[in-house]
A protein has these predicted regions:
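Conserved beta-alpha junction segments in alpha/beta enzyme cores
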Residues: 19-258, 264-266, 274-284, 297, ...
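Anionic-ligand-binding alpha/beta catalytic cores of soluble enzymes and soluble regulatory domains
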Residues: 289
Length: 450
């Protein structure tokens, strides 16, 4: 018989009262129906399901309230949608939303959800034009059910493992800066221009970081983190978790433990140098990311966690607003029936985030600590420089980074990048150059030792 939430939490309370760390994993199918808009309706809608999409994660139980880590195979979850996911998963796990890290892997052949923007579009008679509200609600409900069902099958965590693999010939920086300090070339997720392909990889983090949890010799779950856009090709109507999702699924089967992958600070990083957008290139990229996952697993170092208490810090943070358009211009774009649908969708997304910022809204940025391992959980499409800086702050410890949490801010560049120009710091970024000083302070505070 299925335990009620109250009964399950009572059982868990008796198990962790002596300081024992326990873990439960969960997974739900969140594949949208055929015909669903994909990538906020900026590409062809869903015509086939190549590989189902999942929301998967784990719950850590200790003497404190549970911690929930979840990542969904969506391109974005933003604003009110991000709040809705955190609230639902927190309620299901018997914890509070500030102890939930909700992320996406940013695969483009998937839905993007932002119920705040959808509400503004609905006022203009544009219901379900950006995403399907019912599919979104169903995905949340099914994932929350999976969390509740996981409560009765938690297992003790006796050991934790940390490992690092090097991913070869996958990532390259999207932004090629000229001698004048301005963007000279853009190298996105795929590229066939030989001159652009020939440019150096640029600033990337080649490390794939892994944290695993064990009950004796039995693996319970694996978390991996790698900084790059995951796209090989997209926009052909085939629903898929793309490169990292396919490699992740394969590793789950090989290890017997649920594999949960987070996209790191890959806002300005993609596979363009090594990807021509062909199916053959996708297969090769999957092979390379899989090799990095496997290497990290095989080279991990395990340590006992019998008396460990997971540390969890949260810093609510307001990021400085930026847009090339005034609020009046955005309002006109949204309300003008002669504007194309994509323009109206962009305007709705910009306006709801501006309103949130103006009202003083903040985004939770988290740090999970287990032994000498720390994981930082960030919003938006964070530039890789933040990840590199975070690791440099604690060079003797294990530091991993997950980005693509709340997608409200869009791209989050460095201070210098906004003056260089380019796609990532144009309309798709809702943050100002001062964001770097804000985030550097947050990182320092989260990584500071007690």
């Amino acid at each position: 018989m299925r335990l009620s939430l109250f009964s399950a939490l009572l059982v868990l309370g008796s198990l962790v009262s002596a300081g024992e760390l326990r873990l439960a994993t969960f997974e739900a199918d969140v594949t949208p129906p055929l015909g669903s808009p994909l990538c906020f309706n900026f590409i062809k809608p869903a015509a086939t399901v190549e590989t189902p999409l999942t929301a998967r994660g784990l719950i850590l139980f200790s003497e404190e309230k549970p911690i929930v880590l979840c990542v969904a195979d969506f391109v974005v979850i933003a604003n009110g949608s991000h709040d809705a996911w955190k609230e639902a998963l927190a309620a299901a796990a018997g914890t509070t939303p500030d102890r939930v890290a909700m992320h996406v892997i940013h695969n483009h052949d998937s839905p993007g959800y932002d119920i705040s923007a959808s509400a503004e579009l609905e006022k203009q008679g544009l219901k379900d034009v950006m995403s399907l509200r019912e599919a979104h609600n169903q995905a949340i409900a099914d994932t929350a059910d999976a969390v509740r069902e996981a409560l009765s099958r938690s297992a003790p965590v006796t050991h934790m493992g940390t490992g690092t693999g090097i991913v070869e010939k996958f990532a390259s920086n999207r932004r090629i800066i000229g001698e004048n300090g301005k963007l000279e070339m853009a190298r996105m997720s795929s590229c066939r221009n030989e001159e652009i392909i020939a440019q150096p990889e640029g600033t990337i983090d080649p490390e794939l970081n892994l944290i695993s949890f064990w009950n004796g010799e039995t693996p319970l779950a694996a978390l991996t983190f790698y900084a790059s856009h995951p796209q090989s090709y997209y926009g052909r109507g085939g629903i898929t978790p793309d490169t990292v999702g396919l490699a992740r699924n394969r590793r789950s089967g090989e290890t017997g433990a649920l594999h949960i992958h987070f996209d790191g600070a890959g806002g300005n990083v993609a596979a363009g140098k090594y990807n021509d957008g062909s199916p053959e290139a996708r297969a090769l990229l999957v092979k390379r990311i899989h090799a990095g996952m496997k290497e990290a697993w095989e080279h991990q170092i395990t340590s006992e966690l019998s008396d460990s208490e997971p540390g969890w810090k949260t810093i609510p943070t307001q990021l400085p607003w930026n847009s090339p358009y005034s609020v009046g211009e955005l309002t006109s774009q949204l309300s003008n029936p002669d504007s194309d649908t994509k323009t109206r969708i962009r305007a709705a997304r910009d306006l709801v985030y501006h309103r949130r910022w103006k009202e003083g809204g903040k985004i939770d940025i988290h740090c999970l600590q287990l032994g000498n391992a720390r994981v930082l959980f960030f919003p938006g499409e964070l530039f890789v420089e933040y990840q590199i800086a975070a690791k440099a702050m604690l060079p003797d410890d294990f530091v991993a980074v997950a980005a693509y949490g709340d997608g409200g801010p869009g791209y989050i560049g460095t201070e210098v990048s906004y003056g260089q120009g380019g796609y990532e710091v144009g309309r798709v970024s809702r943050t100002a150059p001062g964001v770097e000083s804000v985030l550097n302070g947050v990182i320092e505070n989260l990584l500071a030792t007690e």
